Amino acid sequence: MKKLRLLLLISLIISCLFAFASCDDTEELSAPQNVEIEQATLTLNWKAVAGARLYTISIAKDGEEPREAIASKTYYSLTGLSEGHYTIKVKANGKEGVSRDSKWSQTVLFDREKETGMTFTLINGNTEYEVSSKGVASGDIVIPDMYRGLPVTSIGKKAFFNKSDVTSVTIGANVKSIGDYAFANCSYITSINLPKGLTTIGESAFASCRLMAGEIVIPEGVTTIPKNAFAYCGSLEAVVFGSNVTRIETSAFTDCAKLTALTLPDKLEYIGNLAFARCKKLTSLDLGTGVKEINDYAFSELVALESVAIPNSVERIGEGAFYLCELLGNVTLGNGIKEIANGAFYDTKLWNANTSSNEIYVGKWFLGCKDNTQPVLNLREDTIGIASYALYGNTGLSTLILPDSVQIIGEAAFGKMSIIVAIIGSGVTEIGSEAFGSCKQLSTLILGSFDDKNENIKYSSLKTIGDYAFRGCEVLDKVEMPSSLKVVGTYAFRDTGIYKNSENVVYADNWVVDYVEGIGANVAIKEGTVGIANYAFYNCTVLSSITLPNSVKTVGRAAFYDCSSLSQVELPATLEVIEDYTFYRCKSLNLFSLPPMLTYIGRSAFYKCGTSANATVGDTDNDVLFIPSDVKYIGDFAFYNCGYSERASIEEEQYYNIFGIDSIVIGGSVEYIGSNAFNGFISLKSVDLGGTQYIAEKAFYKCESLATVDFGTSLKSIGEKAFYKCESLKEVILPETLTDIGSYAFYKCESVANVELGGATAIGSFAFYGNTSLKMLDIPMSVTSIGKQAFRNCKSLTSIIVSPAIEVVEQHAFYGCSSLTIYVAYDKAPDTWHKYWNSSYRPVVYNCELSEDFSYVLYVEKGTISHLNSNSSLSDPVRAGYVFIGWGTSSTASVPAFTSANLSEAESGRKLYAIWAEE
């Protein structure tokens, strides 16, 4: 019996032990989350698991058994893996008696490429890769078309900078951009290709690739060859330019010593300083047909070049442009030249040729004399231009007589000469800056020539006298100006005898050219005066009023710049042009009428006028600024911040109203309103744009009181931020002529309740962002693109039609439009629309037909009425001038069968029509 009891007890104990063993109450750990691979460092990372002691990593290479590794941290380096495809997972290890191991995490896939020495970084919203070097790149570099399923589109700044062990580079077909210094100082690269899709080459991208030989082909998408792009590529033998290159910048091909021939594209307009300097084997140079400017030393030291044809398009040949082209003796000069700068052809065969003539010419331009001390000058009768510094410092001539054929006198052409008499001829139209500067003995100046009997003067057709043109001609006390003259430059007659008897104002014949110390506060310009020179009253802080007679036709650039006390100006009715900066920062200037014959208002012409404590509020009966009907151009910053007071104590409602302008009426001829032209007119309430065609960026920026704008019938383009934060603007009715609405054009115009887009084809990014009062909007069939966040936070907008013409809808276009239903003509969003075009998940009704009168036709099919947010309700469509009644089953229905609320109940395949009633 005792044995039986003992056996039962032992059996019970064993059973309990088994029971306890089978009832392990330790907790299983959670599986690791957020298992990811950091590509830049090839590190496996995951989120820490509470209670984990260690982590086990399972690494399985395709075709091989998995192996396991242990990690005590929440990361593990994968750099030791060989090339191949891997499946990787992680689990958390529990503590004995406390917790159990977790299940495996979700697997991640990993491709270990062959080591290339390159790093790939995601760009452009993680849709593309940019490549750079990790520091070990060497040998033959191959930049792939694709990486991890995405295109490689960019080579980063200094990506392979100074990699002397790189010998060749093959660039993938998808690369569009090569960054600054990307391959600079890769001195052993022997070859490189530029893919056809390339559009951008960075500064110094290939500079000092000294062994890069053969031919470089510039792709068609490239428009600019930037500074130093191929400088010091001493082995480069040929360059083939794409037809769309328009600019070659400074030193782009400097010291490409093996280039033998160049053919530049016809679209090329600009050649920068030193662009092809010291290309010492260049024997053939074709400049194309479009170049306008050859800058300083652009082709200097081309010691093998013998001839060149300058095309008719070239207007300026810069200083030293062909300096030290020792064999250059044959130059054909086009007929468009307006300036040949100092030493443009110095030390060429042209200059050093052994001829009997002392005068040196290129084409019909006089360059200078071999001997600058000769007392005789024999200019050819067909001479049309005098190059800059042509006779500068000549000590032999006492009388200078130019033939009537001469049209242009260059910069400092006759500076510091000992001439006493100068007769410039009747053909001259332009005298360059400092042309006769410091000719201290010059006493007689004839701006024309004598007739055959030497009795009467034939005045020249002179239009421009340049800055400082006669400065320092100490004994010159008289000059007769021709009636053709339009511009007299800054201080053109400063330090001449003309100043000796001047009181207050300095006159050169019938032009005001300067003022003298001691000028009075009130000045009346004498009758018969025809022009005011550039900078004539610059910084004349004592001047408070000036009266200009009706004979004045020209007021020069910056004529009254910084006349801070000037408050009263009477402009003549005959004035046609107000030049750039004319009344710049005349802080005390009060409102006045613009002359009726005005055609041009220059850049910053009235910049910050009327901003000082001395300015007075304009007459309330004269609160309209009329832009005369003949004005075609209003320059950038023309009226910028006029009336923005600096007085901290002024009442808030007057703070921006020193000019007293409530309205602007623009005449019918204006073609262009410049950027920031009326920026800061915060008291402005209404604008009539008349015949304006183009409104540039920020033209009416932050005109916070602007309530009404008549956009006219001619407007074609509205620039970026043109009406930015015009918070009082009520509606935007654009004409059919309009095509472009710039980014931020009507940003945060919070009072705009109605918008008609006219003939717009593109709606820029952020164009109507934050228009919280906007309720209705019909997008016309002309619109093809809607920019990023174009209608973001238009919280009152209830419906919008996206027509079949719209090819592109950018990211977050309708973000924050909390009341919006979107009607779309397609059966789904096209692939050309951004992935997050409807990032607010507003309800979308697909398969809508849109008629020309903005009626709706819906195809109700299964799945086409999409409530992407369960809290959203379908809003009624909106049509200007009508009230929506409901949805009918035929185009003639007058009684609705459905409302927007129960539209989803319509049977599949039914076609419904919007029913409208006139308001």
Q: What are the residue ranges of the model-derived segments?
A:
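Beta-strand-rich modules
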Residues: L78-V98
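Secondary-structure capping and domain/repeat boundary segments
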Residues: T263, S357, I446-G448, V665, ...
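Consensus positions within tandem repeat domains that build extended binding/scaffold surfaces
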Residues: K157-A159, G179-A182, G202-A205, P226-A229, ...
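Structural signature of tandem-repeat unit edges
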Residues: N124-N126, V136-T153, S164-S177, S187-T200, ...
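Short, flexible loop/turn segments at beta-strand junctions in immunoglobulin-like
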Residues: A48, S77-S82, S904-E905
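Conserved aromatic anchor
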Residues: L42-G51, W887
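Extracellular fibronectin type III
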Residues: K95-R112
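Short beta-strand segments within Ig-like beta-sandwich modules, predominantly Fibronectin type-III
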Residues: R67-K73
